[in-house]
Amino acid sequence: MSTKIQTSLTQNILLCLIGIMTIFLFESCARKIAFQASTIVPGAEGTVKVKKDNNSNYTIHVELSNLAEPRKLEPAMKTYVIWMETEQEPVKNIGQINSSSSFLSKRLKASFETVSSIKPTRIFITAEDDGTIQYPGTQILTTNGF
């Protein structure tokens, strides 16, 4: 083979490898989305980061700040519940942020992390009297779709 053909072939192989590596890199990158502004808790802010792991599960990490204690809402509630929507399930309770057990700090910051085998399409938070409730009440914070 001539040197020109070998160089061209080597360049094509390298370009293909870079393309494949780029696809895998973007596939494993986390998506980070901010919660929309809330009319119920106007100062509340937060983000949701969803990342696919090596086992094809999705790690869901929620960071919150300036989220008023649920007992200070009108009407007063006991806890915040985090919900997930997927293409397979309309809505699922994935956990709670309970201020009485110090999940919500004095600085009104909280974080939450869980793993799901199903990719979420939307994450939202409600204030509830019961953290094990199966259907959501009024939404406090919500994301657009992923």
PLM regions: where:
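Bacterial N-terminal signal peptides that target proteins for export
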Residues: 2-16
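C-terminal motif of bacterial Sec signal peptides marking the signal peptidase cleavage site
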Residues: 24-28
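N-terminal targeting/export leaders
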Residues: 2, 29-146
